[in-house]
Design a protein with these regions (language model features):
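Short glycine/proline-enriched turns and hinge-like loops at secondary-structure junctions
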Residues: 1, 58-62, 135, 151-154
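Short, small-residue-biased leader/transition segments that mark boundaries at the very start
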Residues: 2-8
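Conserved loop->alpha-helix
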Residues: 9-52
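Short His-Asn-centered micro-motif
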Residues: 14-15, 46-50, 68, 99-100, ...
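Short, glycine-/Ser/Thr-/acidic-enriched flexible segments
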Residues: 17-19, 50-52, 72-73, 146-147, ...
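Ordered, amphipathic secondary-structure segments that act as subunit-interaction surfaces
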Residues: 44-75
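Charged, compositionally biased interaction regions
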Residues: 91-189
């Protein structure tokens, strides 16, 4: 599992914009922000921060932060623009599972596709940290490929999270561990 983070000119935030994050698992991201902040302008970059392991351990991470959205003022940018800005700041985007038109797609067919995708192994080598066994991906995010106003977010994005992906009985932040990158894992094998 992961923690969403927002990087923009004022600070780095984790999920909420109530206060900037100072957690130890966002240190690397905050250091990166220091290098980028003067170039962001009105751009806000949103992504998954996979630095800390919690409900899923990823075994094929090349880096710890993956961009999933970019906002400029009151607009969420198109997926093409997200990829452009991510590349501009040398940040990877989250993996694309499918890009297709939804014209004529029924709610039932979309639900079946999303549930099917969620039952597959994750692109980043998903593993249950408690058992060490491989597991399916945490879920699937579906978004409109075009740009849309911030006020229309709920009509353009949805996230499906599989039942039971969180198995810890205590909050992961108490005894967190850093997620190793793929080259670190290969070096140990």
């Amino acid at each position: 599992s992961s923690a969403a983070s927002d990087v923009y000119k004022r600070q780095v935030f984790a999920r909420s914009h109530a206060a900037p994050t100072t957690s130890p698992w966002t240190r690397e991201l905050r250091e990166r922000w220091e290098l980028m902040k003067n170039d962001l302008g009105d751009i806000e970059i949103f992504g998954e921060n996979l630095y800390a392991i919690h409900s899923i351990e990823y075994r094929k991470l090349e880096t710890h932060f993956y961009v999933f959205a970019v906002r400029c003022l009151d607009q969420w940018l198109s997926w093409e623009e997200v990829k452009f800005y991510a590349a501009l700041f040398d940040l990877p985007t989250v993996p694309e599972l499918r890009v297709e038109t939804v014209e004529g797609l029924t709610r039932e067919a979309l639900q079946q596709q999303v549930v099917s995708l969620a039952q597959e192994p994750g692109v980043f080598g998903t593993r249950d940290p408690q058992t060490g066994a491989d597991c399916t991906r945490e879920g699937v995010v579906t978004r409109n490929i075009g740009e849309y106003p911030v006020s229309e977010f709920a009509r353009n994005v949805f996230k499906y999270v599989r039942k039971g992906h969180v198995k810890t009985d205590e909050h992961w932040t108490r005894n967190w561990k850093r997620a190793r990158l793929i080259w670190e894992i290969r070096k140990e094998e």
